[in-house]
Amino acid sequence: LTQSLSDWGGMLLLLGVHPYLTPDDLPLLDKKRYRIMYSTMKEVDTHGQWMMKATSGVQVSLDYQSLEDLERKFVILNRLTPFLTAIFANSPILEGEPSGYRSYRGRIWQNTDPYRTGLPLSFLSKKFSLVDYIEWALDVRPYHLYRDGEVVQPGPYTFRQLMKKETSLEMNQDCLLYTSDAADEEAW
């Protein structure tokens, strides 16, 4: 990976946040969905634009054997979040100065979007069920939907409101579809 990056004039930084540049200094991927998200982020909390342009991370996918196994692993991993953040803290520098945090990336995620980030108490409970997650997700406002070949902003409505048709914008099957047509790929 290091060799491949150096061929492009790049280098691998094992950091969770860019140590010198701000979101204003960094490009945004040229996709309509990212432009919508980026402009909306500054309205919902203080660090969403940092998350989109100046952070990096690694995702891990865990398998599960049953619904009960999924629910158990979900709760355990959510309970481990503060410890994992501490163990993998690697973002103490912000804009070239000490940030006062060992994991400024953690701070960014705490201030990205209160509707989508953080840990609801039900996610930590022994009684957690997948229904708790579904109920939580239904009360989140989508940033955008894919509608009739276009990426659209649904306004201030939650998934639940859209599904119950409590708005003039209905949730329908094409919101859930992604096509690989070249024209659609440009917009999406």
Question: PLM ranges: what are they?
Answer:
Residues Y178-D184:
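Conserved small/polar residues in nucleotide/adenosyl-binding loops
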Residues S6-L13, V17-L177:
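Loop-rich catalytic cores of soluble enzymes, especially ATP-dependent carboxylate-amine ligases
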